[in-house]
């Protein structure tokens, strides 16, 4: 089965589908599935754009709204995970995944699905240690910090994925697993991105949480994006069982959707031709969700996952046969994912733009139905319910505390200040950008003009690199575990302090001179050559 893999989408759906159609004609082949590795930007309207962690001057409506409204339909079944530039308010409606538009499926905070027998898993967001052990507490309206922490990976998702035991064919993450660069051509990578050198040498580039999952899940393929460069690697896993054939993972990271950039690759994946062409739930994953339904935290308080350390009565939440039977019964013996997309808010109208539109809290009926069938908790609805209850309590307390010497103004109830989620890896923004945007009126860029697909797309196979380029996975594991352990204590060591890692450049990536920021909007598609590489 031909599967198209896309790096950072950045809302450029029209261009991505046009490129796939061009390649199908050129190679006389048929692509059956598109996988997007984050920064999808499912922006429906002006309110959604204000929920993306990008400054006003870089906001572009792009083309997703056409697929949301039904003006267009995705020509290929599309599955995506979230990155660090998303309309977080919309994705927050679907914590367990769901359709964001007809034929376009979001995998949720983490998820596993099946298509024609191919098992596909994924985790959304990027790793930041100061938010890793918190719950999903973010709510509308987002603050300066929560608009970023909303897309940070949480330990609960990693814990759930580590309960999986059945083989995985494909896994998606936005940021790279830490240490994966040791299993590929590091010299070539650093030639393209020299400013990664220090982090590669220190083994701090990438996500330790993703690295932990890579060592546990050991999928046949792992696809990522985020760093805006194509990079292939081959990792041979170790086995502790005598006689067991060790597994191997082919890793591929891809660039962002720009002309003359390697942002898309077609791969051949074995599939079961007898299986349905409908997207299906994964039974083991649903069983894990059901088993972990009581592990719930919607506060910024840190918490630790159950371990076999004498402190927890249960630490193994892997899928049991009994739970699997319950799930099958709950779903009426049908694992097909229902095509139950529905619009939950108004769509952008280019003829009548609403610059002052503000995003509001919405409970998505897809999530309501999914949770009702499996007996799960809708995190998004729970946050809304808690806010209403807290509001009622606050009103009662205010009525009872007349004459109190305490000044309520001294006690902030804004939880956003509890998470200073400064992200040095982000593409466009930091404090300077936010200050520059103050007082600016929101302006919406029109969708980019027609685009001619790049004819130089490389369709070569994923490279299998020689063993001499590999390093011991023990070294990688030690580094990963160190940072995951540090994330537990980071709250008391100065939560939210920005790291000293170098900023990820947008252009002038050879490292010469100062950092230059270039907009990834229509001007690039009109007359730009390669982006200073």
Swiss-Prot record:
Cleaves the 2'-5' phosphodiester linkage at the branch point of excised lariat intron RNA and converts them into linear molecules that can be subsequently degraded, thereby facilitating ribonucleotide turnover. Linked to its role in pre-mRNA processing mechanism, may also participate in retrovirus replication and have an antiviral cell-intrinsic defense function. Active in presence of diverse metals including Fe(2+), Zn(2+), Mn(2+). Also activated by Ca(2+). Binds two metal cations in two adjacent alpha and beta metal-binding pockets. One of its GO terms (cellular component) is nucleus. It is an enzyme of class 3 (hydrolase). Residues 483-498 have a biased composition (Basic and acidic residues). Binds 2 divalent metal cations per subunit. This is Lariat debranching enzyme B. Residues 124-154 are annotated as: Lariat recognition loop. Residues 392-454, 468-533 are annotated as: Disordered. Keywords: Hydrolase, Iron, Manganese, Metal-binding, mRNA processing, Nucleus, Zinc. One of its GO terms (biological process) is mRNA splicing, via spliceosome. Its cofactor is Fe(2+); Zn(2+); Mn(2+). A divalent metal cation 1 binds at residues 8, 10, 228. The gene is dbr1-b. A divalent metal cation 2 binds at residues 39, 84, 174, 226. Its EC number is 3.1.4.-. Belongs to the lariat debranching enzyme family. It is found in: Nucleus. InterPro entries: Calcineurin-like_PHP_ApaH (IPR004843), DBR1_C (IPR007708), Dbr1_N (IPR041816), Metallo-depent_PP-like (IPR029052). The keyword Hydrolase applies. Residues 412-423 have a biased composition (Polar residues).
